[in-house]
C-alpha cells in the first residue's frame, strides 16, 4: 500500500466515523481521533480520488442574470490539473507564494486545487482590497505569482515586486490570460510527495488595532481540520450546501471548499450585487439546498421575506460571528421547523465549539467542544485551566490537527498565543454544568464599571432583542464616579428614527432585561466603523467615546 493510498484511507476512516455519528455527539466526541498522515495532499489524495468518474456537481453557480455554471467533480479535477500544469510551465514551484484575488467563480476553485497540487502557498485576497493592502500582502507575503480578475489588474499598477501576472476574464497588457490553462495537459504528475506539515495557506487577518497578522496553515490543519466544520454543519454526501461568504476570508475556505468537499457535497453559489431575500429563497428552492450557512446580517435580512415560499427548507442551518436576535431564530423555527445552530472558530483554527446536529440547543450558547478539540477556560488571574469563566483555549498536549502552525514571521506573537501548552483564542467564555460554552467577549474588550465586569457581547445581545436595533457595539465611556459606564453605538432597523424617543425606549429596554450594574448609560446612533472583513473597529469607537460627542444620549436625561 502506497503512502498516498494509506493517507486517503486514514482520512476517509475519520470522515466516515463523523458521518456515522452525525447526530450522536457523545459517541463522536469520545471516539474521534484525528488522522495524522506523514504525507498528505488534499487535492491529490482526497479530491481527485472522490472525483474519479464522478459526474455529480461539485460546484453550481447561479449569476444574478440567471446564467449558470455547473462543474462536476470529474471536470473540476481535470480543470485543476490543467491549471496546475500551466502554472508549472510558467515557473510556479513548490513553496512559492501565490496571491489569489478572485470572486465566486469556477476559476477560484480550480486555482485553489491547482495550487495545492503544486505545493504552492496560497494567499487568499478579497477583491475589495485596494493598492495599499495589496502592497502589504505582496511585500510581507513575498508573493511570486498573482492571479486576479481582469478588472482588478489596475490595482497592481503601483504594487512593486517581481511576480508573474495572470488575469481571469479578460486581456490586460503585461498580464497572461488564465484561459491558456485549458489547453494544458489534463494529466498531472506531482513533483514528489507533500509533507503534511508543509505550508498551504497564509491568511492576512484583518486586525482592528494593528497590521494584519499572517496566519499559517498546513496541508492538514485546514483541509483535515475542517472535518470539524463538516460535523458542525451536519453535511453528508449528496448534500447541496450554500454558504454566504466572500472569497478571501477564512470562512469561505471553511464552508465553500473544505467542509462540503470533505463530505462530497455540492457547493452552491448565488452571486448578486444587491441582496434580494426573495430571489435568494427562490434560487435555494430551485437548487435544492439542503444545508445553509449565513452570517447574522443575512439572517436578519432574510426574515423580511416570506420564508414559507421555500417549499423544501434546508435540513441544517447554521450561523456564526455575532448574536442572532431571538426574533430571527423563532421566525426560522416557525417557517422551516429547524433551529439555527451557532458555532465558534477563528482564522487560526477550524470550528472548536459548536451546536452540532442532534444536540439540544441552548439559547445564547455556542455549544460544546467539537470532536478532536479539548477546550479549556483559563482563569484570568492565574492562567490555570478549569475556570467557570475565562479565556477560551485549546489544550495542545494532544494537539488538534485544526490549529494553525503560528503567525508567520512573528515568533513573539506565536509564542504568546501558544504559551503554557495552550492555544489562547483571546476570547472569554463561560461554561455551564452541561459543558455548554457561552461567549462573553474579546479579552481586551471586557471592561469594569463600578468594579463590576462588563461583557460588551452580553449587552449587545440584549440590545439586539429590541426591534429597533439592527446592529450594536458597546464600549466603555469615561465616568468620574464609576470610572467607566457602558455606552452603545446603535445602527437602527428600517422604520426607526434616531432621536430622543427611540433613545428613551432603548434605555427602558436595557433596564428591563439587564442587571442594574450592566444597564446601558449612554448611547449614540450612527454607522459602525468596520474593517474590510466586517469586524467592528472598537478601538475607533473607544477613541470617539473618549473625545466626547454632542450626539450622545444619557440615561439620566430621561429621568
Where would I find each of the regions flagged by the language model?
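Conserved pre-ATP/AMP-binding loop-to-beta segment of ANL
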Residues: 55-57, 173, 183-204, 210-211, ...
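Conserved AMP-binding/adenylate-forming core of the ANL superfamily
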Residues: 55-113, 130-135, 219-220
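ANL superfamily adenylate-forming
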Residues: 63-66, 151-196
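Conserved AMP-binding A3 loop
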Residues: 69-74, 200-224
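AMP-binding/adenylate-forming catalytic core of the ANL superfamily
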Residues: 129-130, 146-149, 292, 400, ...
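Conserved AMP-binding/adenylation subdomain of ANL enzymes
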Residues: 223-240, 247-290, 305
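Gly/Ser/Thr-rich phosphate-binding loop
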Residues: 262, 289-293, 303-362, 374, ...
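Conserved ATP/PPi-binding loop(s) of AMP-dependent carboxylate-activating enzymes
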Residues: 372, 383-416, 454
Amino acid at each position: 500500500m502506497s503512502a498516498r493510498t494509506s493517507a486517503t484511507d486514514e482520512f476517509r476512516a475519520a470522515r466516515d466515523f463523523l458521518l456515522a455519528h452525525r447526530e450522536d455527539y457523545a459517541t463522536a466526541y469520545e471516539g474521534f481521533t484525528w488522522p495524522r498522515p506523514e504525507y498528505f495532499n488534499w487535492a491529490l489524495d482526497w479530491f481527485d480520488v472522490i472525483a474519479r468518474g464522478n459526474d455529480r456537481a461539485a460546484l453550481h453557480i447561479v449569476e444574478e442574470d440567471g446564467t449558470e455554471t455547473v462543474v462536476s467533480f470529474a471536470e473540476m479535477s481535470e480543470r485543476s490539473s490543467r491549471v496546475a500544469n500551466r502554472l508549472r510551465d510558467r515557473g510556479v514551484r513548490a513553496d512559492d507564494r501565490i496571491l489569489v484575488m478572485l470572486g465566486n467563480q469556477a476559476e477560484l476553485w480550480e486555482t485553489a486545487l491547482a495550487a495545492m497540487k503544486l505545493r504552492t502557498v496560497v494567499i487568499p485576497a478579497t477583491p475589495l482590497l485596494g493598492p495599499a493592502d495589496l502592497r502589504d500582502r505582496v511585500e510581507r507575503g513575498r508573493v511570486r505569482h498573482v492571479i486576479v480578475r481582469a478588472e482588478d489588474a489596475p490595482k497592481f499598477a503601483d504594487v512593486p515586486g517581481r511576480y508573474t501576472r495572470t488575469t481571469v476574464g479578460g486581456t490586460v497588457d503585461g498580464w497572461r490570460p488564465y484561459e491558456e490553462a485549458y489547453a494544458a495537459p489534463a494529466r498531472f504528475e506531482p513533483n514528489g510527495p507533500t509533507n503534511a506539515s508543509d505550508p498551504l495557506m497564509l491568511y492576512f487577518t484583518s486586525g482592528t488595532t494593528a497590521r494584519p497578522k499572517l496566519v499559517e496553515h498546513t496541508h492538514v490543519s485546514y483541509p483535515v481540520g475542517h472535518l470539524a466544520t463538516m460535523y458542525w454543519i451536519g453535511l453528508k454526501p449528496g448534500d447541496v450546501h450554500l454558504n454566504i461568504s466572500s472569497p478571501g476570508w477564512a470562512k469561505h475556505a471553511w464552508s465553500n471548499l473544505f467542509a462540503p468537499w470533505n463530505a462530497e457535497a455540492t457547493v452552491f453559489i448565488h452571486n448578486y450585487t444587491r441582496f434580494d431575500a426573495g430571489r435568494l429563497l427562490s434560487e435555494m428552492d430551485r437548487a435544492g439546498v439542503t444545508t445553509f450557512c449565513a452570517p447574522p446580517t443575512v439572517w436578519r435580512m432574510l426574515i423580511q421575506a416570506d420564508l414559507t415560499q421555500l417549499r423544501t427548507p434546508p435540513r441544517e442551518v447554521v450561523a456564526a460571528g455575532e448574536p442572532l436576535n431571538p426574533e430571527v431564530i423563532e421566525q426560522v423555527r416557525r417557517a422551516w421547523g429547524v433551529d439555527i445552530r451557532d458555532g465558534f472558530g477563528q482564522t487560526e483554527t477550524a470550528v472548536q465549539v459548536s451546536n452540532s446536529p442532534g444536540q439540544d440547543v441552548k439559547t445564547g450558547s455556542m455549544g460544546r467542544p467539537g470532536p478532536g478539540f479539548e477546550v479549556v477556560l483559563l482563569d484570568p488571574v492565574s492562567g490555570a485551566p478549569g475556570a467557570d469563566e475565562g479565556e477560551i483555549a485549546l489544550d495542545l498536549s494532544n494537539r488538534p490537527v485544526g490549529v494553525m502552525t503560528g503567525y508567520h514571521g512573528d515568533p513573539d506573537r506565536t509564542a504568546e498565543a501558544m504559551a503554557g501548552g495552550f492555544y489562547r483564542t483571546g476570547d472569554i467564555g463561560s461554561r455551564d454544568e452541561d459543558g455548554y460554552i457561552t461567549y462573553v467577549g474579546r479579552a481586551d474588550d471586557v471592561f469594569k464599571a463600578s468594579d463590576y465586569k462588563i461583557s460588551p457581547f452580553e449587552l449587545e445581545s440584549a440590545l439586539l432583542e429590541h426591534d429597533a436595533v439592527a446592529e450594536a457595539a458597546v464600549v466603555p465611556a469615561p465616568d468620574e464616579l464609576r470610572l467607566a459606564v457602558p455606552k452603545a453605538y446603535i445602527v437602527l432597523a428600517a422604520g426607526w428614527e434616531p432621536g430622543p424617543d427611540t433613545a428613551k425606549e432603548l434605555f427602558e429596554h436595557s433596564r428591563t432585561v439587564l442587571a442594574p450594574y450592566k444597564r446601558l448609560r449612554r448611547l449614540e446612533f450612527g454607522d459602525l466603523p468596520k474593517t474590510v472583513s466586517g469586524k467592528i473597529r472598537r478601538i475607533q469607537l473607544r477613541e470617539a467615546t473618549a473625545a466626547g460627542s454632542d450626539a450622545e444620549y444619557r440615561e439620566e436625561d430621561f429621568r
